[in-house]
Amino acid sequence: MIFDTDVLIWFLRGDGAAARLIESQSDRAISMISAMELLQGARSRAEIKTIHQFIQQSDIRLVPVNESISHVALSLIEAHALAAGLRVADALIAATAREGALPLATGNARHFKAIAGLEVKAFRPEAG
């Protein structure tokens, strides 16, 4: 399963639902884009260290953006940016999940609902 950035943020904030979801999956993966978004949102060196520890200790596979994912994301932007407001990071994350034939766990299912061939698992945090 690919985890969207929001699920990871909830996990790092101590949300039990996010922890259960992540821990229940034997194949845990995130797009390199999500790792970048987490690091970009860090407010201190300590938070950066926490993010790195989380990725290592959770046995989460980082999926790089390759040529195939880039081309799929480009077509998703073309198809969904105007009508649905699909943004670049979400297109790359969706393309990563679709190319890997993995479901995408996200609290923002509406961002991805129009994308054919993408299995979306809606996530709802305990705190939300």
Give the ranges of each region predicted by the language model.
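Amphipathic alpha-helical segments within well-ordered protein domains
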Residues: 36-39, 74
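Nucleotide phosphate-binding site architecture
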Residues: 8-9, 39, 113, 121
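Short, structured coil segments at secondary-structure junctions
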Residues: 24-25, 58, 115-116
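Active-site neighborhoods of divalent-metal-dependent phosphate/nucleic-acid chemistry enzymes
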Residues: 60-107
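Generic structural signal for small/hydrophobic residues in well-ordered secondary structure
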Residues: 4-5, 38, 97, 112
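Acidic, PIN/NYN-like endoribonuclease modules and their adjacent C-terminal/linker elements
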Residues: 99-128
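Short, well-structured N-terminal submotif of metal-dependent ribonuclease cores
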Residues: 1-30, 40-53, 127-128
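Alpha-helix capping/helix-boundary segments
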Residues: 7-8, 34, 69, 92-93, ...
